[in-house]
Amino acid sequence: MSIVTVQLGQCGNQIGFEVFDALLSDSHSSQGLCCKRENEAYQASCKERFFSEEENGVPIARAVLVDMEPKVINQTLSKAAQSGRWKYGQHACFCQKQGSGNNWAYGYSVHGPRHEESIMDLIRKEVEKCDSFSGFFIIMSMAGGTGSGIGAFVTQNLQDQYSNSLKMNQIIWPYGTGEVIVQNYNSILTLSHLYRSSDALLVHENDAVHKICAKLMNIKQISFSDINQVLAHQLGSVFQPTYSAESSFHYRRNPLGDLMEHLVPHPEFKMLSIRNVPHMSENSLAYSTFTWAGLLKHLRQMLISNAKMEEGIDWHARPPLSGLPSLGKMSLNKDLHFNTSIANLVILRGKDVQSADVEGFKDPALYTSWLEPVNAFNVWKTQRAFSKYEKSAVLVSNSQFLVKPLDMIVRKAWNMFASKAYIHQYTKFGIEEEDFLDSFTSLEQVVASYCNL
Protein backbone atom coordinates (compact mmCIF):
# COMPACT_ATOMS: atom_id res chain seq x y z
CA MET A 1 0.00 0.00 0.00
CA SER A 2 1.19 3.50 -0.83
CA ILE A 3 1.87 6.45 1.46
CA VAL A 4 1.46 10.06 0.30
CA THR A 5 3.96 12.36 1.99
CA VAL A 6 3.05 16.01 2.54
CA GLN A 7 6.11 18.24 3.03
CA LEU A 8 5.29 21.56 4.71
CA GLY A 9 7.51 24.60 5.09
CA GLN A 10 11.30 24.83 4.96
CA CYS A 11 11.80 22.14 7.58
CA GLY A 12 9.32 19.68 6.06
CA ASN A 13 10.67 20.05 2.55
CA GLN A 14 14.32 19.69 3.50
CA ILE A 15 13.66 16.62 5.66
CA GLY A 16 11.33 15.14 3.05
CA PHE A 17 14.07 15.25 0.43
CA GLU A 18 16.53 13.47 2.75
CA VAL A 19 13.94 10.80 3.60
CA PHE A 20 13.20 9.92 -0.04
CA ASP A 21 16.89 10.00 -0.88
CA ALA A 22 17.73 7.69 2.04
CA LEU A 23 14.94 5.25 1.14
CA LEU A 24 16.00 4.92 -2.48
CA SER A 25 19.71 4.85 -1.66
CA ASP A 26 19.13 1.99 0.79
CA SER A 27 16.84 0.02 -1.51
CA HIS A 28 19.44 0.14 -4.31
CA SER A 29 22.49 -0.55 -2.15
CA SER A 30 24.26 -3.84 -2.79
CA GLN A 31 23.51 -5.97 0.25
CA GLY A 32 25.33 -9.27 0.52
CA LEU A 33 23.03 -10.57 3.25
CA CYS A 34 20.09 -11.74 1.17
CA CYS A 35 19.45 -13.38 -2.17
CA LYS A 36 18.69 -11.54 -5.40
CA ARG A 37 14.99 -12.48 -5.30
CA GLU A 38 14.59 -11.15 -1.79
CA ASN A 39 16.45 -7.95 -2.65
CA GLU A 40 14.16 -7.38 -5.64
CA ALA A 41 11.09 -7.93 -3.46
CA TYR A 42 12.46 -5.40 -0.95
CA GLN A 43 13.02 -2.83 -3.70
CA ALA A 44 9.55 -3.40 -5.15
CA SER A 45 7.92 -2.99 -1.73
CA CYS A 46 9.81 0.25 -1.06
CA LYS A 47 8.83 1.64 -4.46
CA GLU A 48 5.17 0.75 -4.02
CA ARG A 49 5.08 2.61 -0.71
CA PHE A 50 6.89 5.80 -1.60
CA PHE A 51 7.35 6.12 -5.38
CA SER A 52 5.46 5.91 -8.63
CA GLU A 53 7.31 5.45 -11.91
CA GLU A 54 7.58 7.36 -15.15
CA GLU A 55 7.59 5.59 -18.50
CA ASN A 56 11.37 5.97 -18.64
CA GLY A 57 11.67 4.17 -15.30
CA VAL A 58 12.64 7.15 -13.11
CA PRO A 59 10.97 6.85 -9.67
CA ILE A 60 8.79 9.81 -8.70
CA ALA A 61 8.21 10.52 -5.01
CA ARG A 62 4.60 10.20 -3.87
CA ALA A 63 4.75 13.65 -2.31
CA VAL A 64 3.19 17.09 -2.26
CA LEU A 65 5.48 20.03 -1.43
CA VAL A 66 4.01 23.14 0.21
CA ASP A 67 5.75 26.36 1.22
CA MET A 68 4.84 30.03 1.16
CA GLU A 69 8.23 30.98 -0.29
CA PRO A 70 9.72 29.44 -3.47
CA LYS A 71 13.41 29.22 -2.51
CA VAL A 72 13.44 25.97 -0.52
CA ILE A 73 11.03 24.16 -2.86
CA ASN A 74 13.14 25.11 -5.89
CA GLN A 75 16.27 23.87 -4.12
CA THR A 76 14.53 20.64 -3.12
CA LEU A 77 13.26 19.93 -6.65
CA SER A 78 16.70 20.63 -8.07
CA LYS A 79 18.55 18.37 -5.60
CA ALA A 80 16.18 15.48 -6.30
CA ALA A 81 16.55 15.84 -10.07
CA GLN A 82 20.34 16.15 -9.80
CA SER A 83 20.56 12.92 -7.81
CA GLY A 84 19.78 11.05 -11.03
CA ARG A 85 18.02 8.34 -8.99
CA TRP A 86 14.58 9.89 -8.45
CA LYS A 87 12.64 13.14 -8.67
CA TYR A 88 9.49 14.89 -7.54
CA GLY A 89 6.38 15.12 -9.70
CA GLN A 90 6.20 17.96 -12.18
CA HIS A 91 2.97 19.34 -10.70
CA ALA A 92 3.35 18.31 -7.05
CA CYS A 93 4.34 21.68 -5.59
CA PHE A 94 2.55 24.70 -4.18
CA CYS A 95 4.44 27.84 -3.24
CA GLN A 96 3.83 31.56 -2.96
CA LYS A 97 6.07 34.59 -2.59
CA GLN A 98 5.12 35.62 0.95
CA GLY A 99 6.05 33.61 4.05
CA SER A 100 4.21 33.35 7.35
CA GLY A 101 6.72 35.36 9.38
CA ASN A 102 7.00 32.69 12.10
CA ASN A 103 3.40 33.48 13.02
CA TRP A 104 1.27 30.36 13.50
CA ALA A 105 -1.93 32.39 13.23
CA TYR A 106 -0.96 33.79 9.84
CA GLY A 107 -0.21 30.32 8.49
CA TYR A 108 -3.34 28.75 9.97
CA SER A 109 -5.90 31.54 9.53
CA VAL A 110 -4.68 33.36 6.40
CA HIS A 111 -2.50 31.17 4.17
CA GLY A 112 -4.40 27.98 4.99
CA PRO A 113 -7.94 29.07 4.01
CA ARG A 114 -6.66 31.23 1.14
CA HIS A 115 -4.85 28.33 -0.55
CA GLU A 116 -6.90 25.41 0.74
CA GLU A 117 -8.42 24.48 -2.61
CA SER A 118 -5.11 24.48 -4.50
CA ILE A 119 -3.24 22.47 -1.85
CA MET A 120 -6.00 19.90 -1.35
CA ASP A 121 -6.35 19.49 -5.12
CA LEU A 122 -2.65 18.57 -5.39
CA ILE A 123 -3.05 16.06 -2.56
CA ARG A 124 -6.17 14.56 -4.14
CA LYS A 125 -4.35 14.02 -7.44
CA GLU A 126 -1.47 12.30 -5.64
CA VAL A 127 -3.85 10.01 -3.75
CA GLU A 128 -5.63 9.09 -6.99
CA LYS A 129 -2.34 7.83 -8.45
CA CYS A 130 -2.14 5.15 -5.74
CA ASP A 131 -3.51 1.70 -6.61
CA SER A 132 -3.85 0.99 -2.90
CA PHE A 133 -3.69 3.91 -0.44
CA SER A 134 -2.46 3.52 3.15
CA GLY A 135 -2.52 7.10 4.41
CA PHE A 136 -0.60 10.34 4.83
CA PHE A 137 2.82 11.03 6.28
CA ILE A 138 3.01 14.76 7.07
CA ILE A 139 6.43 16.31 7.75
CA MET A 140 6.49 19.70 9.48
CA SER A 141 8.09 21.82 12.16
CA MET A 142 6.32 22.82 15.34
CA ALA A 143 7.72 26.25 16.06
CA GLY A 144 7.59 28.27 12.83
CA GLY A 145 4.71 29.74 10.86
CA THR A 146 4.26 27.95 7.54
CA GLY A 147 5.10 24.39 8.56
CA SER A 148 3.25 24.58 11.85
CA GLY A 149 0.31 26.85 11.03
CA ILE A 150 -0.46 25.57 7.54
CA GLY A 151 0.56 22.09 8.69
CA ALA A 152 -2.14 22.12 11.37
CA PHE A 153 -4.66 23.50 8.87
CA VAL A 154 -3.85 20.91 6.19
CA THR A 155 -3.93 18.03 8.68
CA GLN A 156 -7.36 19.18 9.84
CA ASN A 157 -8.55 19.24 6.23
CA LEU A 158 -7.15 15.76 5.62
CA GLN A 159 -9.11 14.53 8.62
CA ASP A 160 -12.28 16.13 7.24
CA GLN A 161 -11.84 14.87 3.67
CA TYR A 162 -10.08 11.53 4.28
CA SER A 163 -11.54 10.52 7.62
CA ASN A 164 -11.00 6.80 6.93
CA SER A 165 -7.33 7.22 5.96
CA LEU A 166 -4.50 7.24 8.49
CA LYS A 167 -2.54 10.40 9.22
CA MET A 168 0.86 10.40 10.90
CA ASN A 169 2.59 13.73 11.54
CA GLN A 170 6.34 13.83 11.92
CA ILE A 171 7.06 16.98 13.93
CA ILE A 172 10.35 18.64 14.79
CA TRP A 173 10.51 19.76 18.42
CA PRO A 174 12.34 23.12 18.68
CA TYR A 175 15.65 23.66 20.44
CA GLY A 176 15.17 24.38 24.14
CA THR A 177 17.22 27.55 23.88
CA GLY A 178 14.85 28.86 21.23
CA GLU A 179 14.97 29.64 17.55
CA VAL A 180 11.92 31.94 17.49
CA ILE A 181 10.74 34.18 20.32
CA VAL A 182 7.13 32.97 19.97
CA GLN A 183 8.07 29.31 19.40
CA ASN A 184 6.27 28.17 22.57
CA TYR A 185 3.01 29.78 21.41
CA ASN A 186 3.40 28.21 17.97
CA SER A 187 4.20 24.85 19.55
CA ILE A 188 1.19 24.63 21.86
CA LEU A 189 -1.17 25.72 19.08
CA THR A 190 0.33 23.17 16.68
CA LEU A 191 0.26 20.27 19.14
CA SER A 192 -3.24 20.90 20.45
CA HIS A 193 -4.67 21.07 16.91
CA LEU A 194 -2.77 18.00 15.72
CA TYR A 195 -3.92 16.04 18.75
CA ARG A 196 -7.47 16.48 17.47
CA SER A 197 -6.87 15.67 13.79
CA SER A 198 -3.86 13.31 13.55
CA ASP A 199 -3.70 9.61 14.42
CA ALA A 200 -0.10 9.72 15.66
CA LEU A 201 2.66 12.27 16.26
CA LEU A 202 6.17 11.04 15.59
CA VAL A 203 8.37 13.47 17.49
CA HIS A 204 12.03 14.33 16.91
CA GLU A 205 13.70 16.72 19.36
CA ASN A 206 16.26 19.02 17.75
CA ASP A 207 18.44 19.01 20.86
CA ALA A 208 18.64 15.20 20.88
CA VAL A 209 19.44 14.92 17.16
CA HIS A 210 22.07 17.64 17.53
CA LYS A 211 23.78 15.57 20.25
CA ILE A 212 23.74 12.49 18.01
CA CYS A 213 25.52 14.48 15.30
CA ALA A 214 28.11 15.82 17.76
CA LYS A 215 28.79 12.80 19.96
CA LEU A 216 28.05 9.77 17.79
CA MET A 217 28.75 11.07 14.29
CA ASN A 218 31.70 13.24 15.42
CA ILE A 219 30.58 16.19 13.28
CA LYS A 220 32.37 19.39 14.32
CA GLN A 221 30.26 22.05 12.59
CA ILE A 222 26.73 20.70 12.51
CA SER A 223 24.46 21.88 9.70
CA PHE A 224 20.72 21.43 9.17
CA SER A 225 21.64 18.96 6.43
CA ASP A 226 23.53 16.83 8.99
CA ILE A 227 20.54 16.87 11.33
CA ASN A 228 18.11 16.06 8.53
CA GLN A 229 20.21 13.09 7.40
CA VAL A 230 20.06 11.62 10.92
CA LEU A 231 16.28 12.10 10.91
CA ALA A 232 16.02 10.48 7.48
CA HIS A 233 18.10 7.51 8.63
CA GLN A 234 15.81 6.96 11.61
CA LEU A 235 12.64 7.31 9.55
CA GLY A 236 13.97 5.04 6.82
CA SER A 237 14.84 2.37 9.37
CA VAL A 238 11.18 2.39 10.44
CA PHE A 239 9.45 2.60 7.06
CA GLN A 240 11.56 0.30 4.90
CA PRO A 241 9.96 -3.14 4.37
CA THR A 242 10.00 -5.89 7.01
CA TYR A 243 8.39 -9.32 7.07
CA SER A 244 4.81 -9.63 8.24
CA ALA A 245 5.73 -12.61 10.43
CA GLU A 246 8.85 -14.63 11.22
CA SER A 247 7.69 -17.50 9.04
CA SER A 248 6.50 -15.28 6.20
CA PHE A 249 8.29 -14.44 2.97
CA HIS A 250 6.04 -11.49 2.23
CA TYR A 251 6.76 -7.91 3.22
CA ARG A 252 4.20 -5.93 5.18
CA ARG A 253 1.76 -4.18 2.89
CA ASN A 254 0.29 -1.54 5.20
CA PRO A 255 3.13 0.14 7.12
CA LEU A 256 1.09 3.02 8.56
CA GLY A 257 -1.77 0.76 9.58
CA ASP A 258 0.57 -1.75 11.21
CA LEU A 259 2.39 1.00 13.13
CA MET A 260 -0.86 2.52 14.41
CA GLU A 261 -2.34 -0.84 15.35
CA HIS A 262 0.69 -1.75 17.45
CA LEU A 263 1.58 1.62 18.95
CA VAL A 264 -1.55 3.75 19.39
CA PRO A 265 -4.12 1.68 21.32
CA HIS A 266 -5.91 4.75 22.75
CA PRO A 267 -6.56 8.21 21.20
CA GLU A 268 -5.36 9.97 24.37
CA PHE A 269 -1.84 8.64 23.77
CA LYS A 270 -0.44 9.61 20.35
CA MET A 271 3.19 10.61 21.00
CA LEU A 272 5.80 8.31 19.41
CA SER A 273 9.60 8.40 19.59
CA ILE A 274 12.36 6.65 17.62
CA ARG A 275 15.61 5.34 19.08
CA ASN A 276 18.08 3.41 16.98
CA VAL A 277 21.37 1.56 17.42
CA PRO A 278 24.04 1.71 16.22
CA HIS A 279 24.61 5.23 14.95
CA MET A 280 28.16 6.24 14.10
CA SER A 281 30.47 7.81 11.54
CA GLU A 282 31.91 5.85 8.63
CA ASN A 283 35.37 6.01 10.22
CA SER A 284 34.17 4.50 13.51
CA LEU A 285 32.08 1.86 11.75
CA ALA A 286 35.13 0.39 10.03
CA TYR A 287 36.53 -0.63 13.43
CA SER A 288 33.29 -1.79 15.07
CA THR A 289 31.51 -5.11 15.39
CA PHE A 290 28.06 -5.68 16.82
CA THR A 291 26.09 -8.49 18.43
CA TRP A 292 22.32 -8.63 18.72
CA ALA A 293 22.63 -9.13 22.48
CA GLY A 294 24.73 -5.98 22.84
CA LEU A 295 22.52 -3.84 20.59
CA LEU A 296 19.31 -4.91 22.32
CA LYS A 297 20.78 -4.48 25.81
CA HIS A 298 21.60 -0.86 24.97
CA LEU A 299 18.25 -0.25 23.28
CA ARG A 300 16.30 -1.59 26.26
CA GLN A 301 18.23 0.58 28.71
CA MET A 302 17.74 3.61 26.45
CA LEU A 303 14.00 2.97 26.73
CA ILE A 304 14.02 2.48 30.50
CA SER A 305 16.15 5.55 31.23
CA ASN A 306 14.65 7.71 28.46
CA ALA A 307 18.04 8.15 26.78
CA LYS A 308 17.95 9.43 23.20
CA MET A 309 21.27 7.85 22.19
CA GLU A 310 23.72 5.16 23.24
CA GLU A 311 26.23 7.51 24.81
CA GLY A 312 25.47 8.63 28.37
CA ILE A 313 22.86 5.98 29.19
CA ASP A 314 21.87 5.86 32.88
CA TRP A 315 22.53 2.21 33.73
CA HIS A 316 21.18 2.69 37.27
CA ALA A 317 17.60 3.23 36.08
CA ARG A 318 15.57 0.07 36.63
CA PRO A 319 11.95 -0.93 36.12
CA PRO A 320 10.04 -1.74 39.32
CA LEU A 321 9.84 -5.37 40.34
CA SER A 322 6.76 -7.06 38.90
CA GLY A 323 3.79 -6.84 41.22
CA LEU A 324 5.14 -3.90 43.22
CA PRO A 325 4.00 -0.29 42.84
CA SER A 326 6.50 1.81 40.92
CA LEU A 327 8.42 4.18 43.16
CA GLY A 328 9.81 5.87 40.11
CA LYS A 329 6.63 6.87 38.35
CA MET A 330 6.93 10.08 36.44
CA SER A 331 6.69 13.23 38.51
CA LEU A 332 7.23 16.65 37.06
CA ASN A 333 9.03 17.72 40.25
CA LYS A 334 11.47 14.80 40.35
CA ASP A 335 14.03 13.23 38.10
CA LEU A 336 12.79 10.57 35.73
CA HIS A 337 13.62 7.30 37.46
CA PHE A 338 11.86 5.07 34.97
CA ASN A 339 10.15 5.63 31.64
CA THR A 340 6.83 3.73 31.56
CA SER A 341 5.61 2.56 28.14
CA ILE A 342 2.20 2.00 26.61
CA ALA A 343 3.53 0.13 23.58
CA ASN A 344 6.86 -0.67 21.95
CA LEU A 345 7.86 -1.90 18.51
CA VAL A 346 11.38 -3.21 17.86
CA ILE A 347 12.50 -3.47 14.22
CA LEU A 348 15.57 -5.62 13.55
CA ARG A 349 17.48 -5.63 10.27
CA GLY A 350 20.54 -7.59 9.24
CA LYS A 351 22.68 -10.66 9.63
CA ASP A 352 21.47 -13.57 11.81
CA VAL A 353 18.36 -11.59 12.71
CA GLN A 354 16.42 -14.73 13.67
CA SER A 355 18.88 -15.33 16.52
CA ALA A 356 18.10 -11.99 18.19
CA ASP A 357 16.49 -12.39 21.63
CA VAL A 358 13.89 -9.70 22.41
CA GLU A 359 12.51 -11.26 25.61
CA GLY A 360 13.76 -8.28 27.65
CA PHE A 361 11.16 -6.07 25.96
CA LYS A 362 8.33 -8.35 27.08
CA ASP A 363 8.87 -7.58 30.78
CA PRO A 364 5.47 -6.52 32.23
CA ALA A 365 7.26 -3.99 34.46
CA LEU A 366 8.05 -1.88 31.37
CA TYR A 367 4.40 -1.24 30.61
CA THR A 368 1.34 0.46 32.01
CA SER A 369 -0.91 -1.88 33.97
CA TRP A 370 -3.92 -1.58 31.65
CA LEU A 371 -2.23 -3.34 28.71
CA GLU A 372 -1.00 -6.92 28.63
CA PRO A 373 2.65 -7.15 27.48
CA VAL A 374 1.57 -9.57 24.76
CA ASN A 375 -0.46 -6.69 23.27
CA ALA A 376 2.03 -3.94 24.15
CA PHE A 377 5.13 -5.31 22.41
CA ASN A 378 5.81 -6.33 18.81
CA VAL A 379 8.91 -7.15 16.81
CA TRP A 380 9.44 -6.89 13.04
CA LYS A 381 12.43 -8.47 11.31
CA THR A 382 14.22 -8.82 8.01
CA GLN A 383 17.64 -10.25 7.27
CA ARG A 384 18.27 -7.51 4.73
CA ALA A 385 20.58 -4.95 6.30
CA PHE A 386 19.68 -1.25 6.36
CA SER A 387 22.02 1.44 5.09
CA LYS A 388 25.66 0.78 6.02
CA TYR A 389 25.04 -1.37 9.11
CA GLU A 390 25.40 -5.16 9.07
CA LYS A 391 23.05 -5.28 12.08
CA SER A 392 20.73 -2.52 13.27
CA ALA A 393 17.82 -2.17 15.67
CA VAL A 394 15.23 0.58 15.99
CA LEU A 395 12.70 1.11 18.76
CA VAL A 396 9.46 2.99 18.08
CA SER A 397 7.90 3.72 21.44
CA ASN A 398 4.75 5.22 22.91
CA SER A 399 5.93 6.18 26.39
CA GLN A 400 6.41 9.01 28.89
CA PHE A 401 9.45 10.24 26.91
CA LEU A 402 7.98 13.67 26.11
CA VAL A 403 6.32 14.61 29.41
CA LYS A 404 9.09 16.92 30.64
CA PRO A 405 9.70 18.76 27.32
CA LEU A 406 5.95 19.15 26.78
CA ASP A 407 5.35 20.44 30.30
CA MET A 408 8.24 22.88 29.87
CA ILE A 409 6.81 24.31 26.64
CA VAL A 410 3.33 24.64 28.14
CA ARG A 411 4.71 26.45 31.21
CA LYS A 412 6.85 28.82 29.13
CA ALA A 413 3.92 29.62 26.86
CA TRP A 414 1.64 30.13 29.88
CA ASN A 415 4.09 32.59 31.48
CA MET A 416 4.16 34.63 28.27
CA PHE A 417 0.38 34.41 27.92
CA ALA A 418 -0.17 35.56 31.52
CA SER A 419 1.73 38.76 30.74
CA LYS A 420 -0.08 39.15 27.38
CA ALA A 421 3.23 39.09 25.52
CA TYR A 422 2.85 39.07 21.70
CA ILE A 423 -0.83 38.04 21.93
CA HIS A 424 -1.78 40.84 19.54
CA GLN A 425 0.24 39.16 16.76
CA TYR A 426 -2.22 36.27 16.93
CA THR A 427 -5.51 38.04 17.68
CA LYS A 428 -5.15 40.27 14.63
CA PHE A 429 -5.33 37.11 12.49
CA GLY A 430 -8.30 35.57 14.28
CA ILE A 431 -6.68 33.42 16.97
CA GLU A 432 -8.35 34.58 20.18
CA GLU A 433 -7.34 34.21 23.82
CA GLU A 434 -9.92 31.43 24.14
CA ASP A 435 -8.00 29.44 21.52
CA PHE A 436 -4.88 29.68 23.66
CA LEU A 437 -6.80 28.60 26.76
CA ASP A 438 -8.23 25.61 24.87
CA SER A 439 -4.71 24.65 23.80
CA PHE A 440 -3.38 24.89 27.35
CA THR A 441 -6.24 22.76 28.67
CA SER A 442 -5.79 20.13 25.96
CA LEU A 443 -2.04 19.75 26.48
CA GLU A 444 -2.22 19.82 30.28
CA GLN A 445 -4.57 16.84 29.95
CA VAL A 446 -2.04 15.06 27.70
CA VAL A 447 0.71 15.64 30.29
CA ALA A 448 -1.52 14.38 33.09
CA SER A 449 -2.54 11.27 31.14
CA TYR A 450 1.06 10.28 30.42
CA CYS A 451 2.12 11.06 34.00
CA ASN A 452 -0.51 8.68 35.35
CA LEU A 453 0.61 5.63 33.38
UniProtKB/Swiss-Prot annotation:
GO terms for biological process: cell projection organization; microtubule-based process; positive regulation of smoothened signaling pathway. The keyword Nucleus applies. Keywords: Cell projection, Cilium biogenesis/degradation, Cytoplasm, Cytoskeleton, Developmental protein, GTP-binding, Microtubule, Nucleotide-binding, Nucleus. Its main location: nucleus. One of its GO terms (cellular component) is cytoplasm. PROSITE patterns: TUBULIN (PS00227). GTP binds at A143, G144, G145, T146, G147, S148, G149. GO terms for molecular function: GTP binding; structural constituent of cytoskeleton. Disulfide bonds: none annotated. It is found in: Nucleus; Cytoplasm; Cytoplasm, Cytoskeleton, Microtubule organizing center, Centrosome, Centriole; Cell projection, Cilium. It comes from the Eukaryota. Pfam families: Tubulin. Acts as a positive regulator of hedgehog signaling and regulates ciliary function. Found in a complex with TEDC1, TEDC2, TUBE1 and TUBD1. Belongs to the tubulin family. PANTHER family: TUBULIN (PTHR11588). This is Tubulin delta chain.
